[in-house]
Amino acid sequence: MTQYRITFEGPVILGAGLAGLTAALSATTGAAKTALVLSPTPLASGCSSAWAQGGMAAALSGDDSPALHAADTIAAGAGLCDPQAVDLLTREGPQAVRDLAALGAPFDRKADDGFVLSLEAAHSAARVARVGGDGAGAAIMAAVIAAVRATPGIEVRENARARRLLQDANGRVVGVLADVDGALVEIRSTAVILATGGVGGLYAVTTTPAQVRGEGLGLAALAGAMIADPEFVQFHPTAIDIGRDPAPLATEALRGEGAILRNADGKAFMADYHPAKELAPRDVVARALHAERAAGRGAFLDATAAVGAHFPHEFPAVFEACMSAGIDPRRQMIPVTPAVHYHMGGVATDLDGRASLPGLYAAGECASTGVQGANRLASNSLLEAAVFGARAGRAAAAEGATGGPPVSLEPLPDLPDAALQGLRKAMSRDAGVIRDADGLTRLLGEIETLEAGHGQGPILVAARLIVTAALAREESRGGHCRIDFPATDPVGVRTFVTLDGREPGLRYAAE
């Protein structure tokens, strides 16, 4: 039973990463505009944006262009990118980076004040704007948070977790039921923007905050929203394998600087898997590491020659993580493992963040604009959050309809921690880098058992969506690898999913 009700004039934004806060800033541009941000954790903690190391990819040099950036994005996306969305991202990307710099994001600069740009895997040009080598996410978020706190129209509620999307009798989203400081609160609004991040916390090994576990995806699906491409989960190939949860990340930029992947025998093995070697797309590199580890040869990142003595100031986050485990990356190889890093799927939206339900928007990793395809290009995630977060904020702020009273005020079922930890292990085992029908079928049965015991809540629904779509896609493409269906179909076809009762109903549409 709700303890009190709030009626809010502007959009309510669930999540406080780069997409959510950019949406809030965009929604409050202009007189008398307001936005309410709900964050389950204090700002600057608990969101993947603040953990991002590589930077933001954009055509910021005279040797580059949005068209080249778009071509690289589409190539990495393995046939499933929406060209219109990619074109928009790459055209608006340079200004998005400049806007963040204007807010105070301290991007690395050259003597002429131009951006220092790095090369990363599957990019045809150096186009990644960085901060302090590997500190882009934290520095960008600090600047954005300062701007949010300085904007009178933005209200932030920390320790606030969404428990249900509120809908009227016509299905319109009219607000959110949230646990705010232990009280169940009915928040009515003209629009809700989901900016809840990805699904890393559904897996045992992830580079994202463990509390980012697909709840926004599940909330939207349980409300009846269309979900796109949930089977496509990106595994970053070089999480630092030191037994920490979440696993620290060894940024892609290290390989861009010339770091080499070796096995325990010291052999540089990437030439056996792809002509681009260490700079192959992430899905290729992740599968190569998985194969080396499965064969008992181990996998290590050797940056002793490429970075060496420069580690402490060029890649301080990686250096600190390694040293905390007794590994000196200036002289020793770094043990690495694939880890869940990003979800290409999400709530299906148009180019302004509109979901299939009136009143509902989504931006950032929890959305699927069609930009990322079956495999995200390195350093496109912060860019997508900034570009599409701003667009969603503007569109949601323009919503005029309020809808009727909500038909249900009951919180959706939660999942106890012990059950969640078991789910994480099962997801890594059967819906990980390598998948097959036997494992996915077994995993789906385990999810059904958990649903029978704990109810069909957002976390389990998010897991079910991933597994059901992975079982249905009988091919290998991008981040989805089926060892029982290793070939890639000639025509790329996206997945669209809606929940119909307990079972996801899948349909496909060629892009």
From Swiss-Prot:
The record marks 120 as: Important in orienting the L-aspartate substrate. It catalyses: L-aspartate + O2 = iminosuccinate + H2O2. Keywords: Cytoplasm, FAD, Flavoprotein, Nucleotide-binding, Oxidoreductase, Pyridine nucleotide biosynthesis. Its EC number is 1.4.3.16. Its cofactor is FAD. SUPFAM superfamilies: FAD/NAD(P)-binding domain (SSF51905), Succinate dehydrogenase/fumarate reductase flavoprotein C-terminal domain (SSF46977), Succinate dehydrogenase/fumarate reductase flavoprotein, catalytic domain (SSF56425). The active site is at 282 (proton donor/acceptor). It is found in: Cytoplasm. Binds 1 FAD per subunit. Disulfide bonds: none annotated. Pfam families: FAD_binding_2, Succ_DH_flav_C. GO terms for cellular component: cytoplasm. Belongs to the FAD-dependent oxidoreductase 2 family. NadB subfamily. This is L-aspartate oxidase.
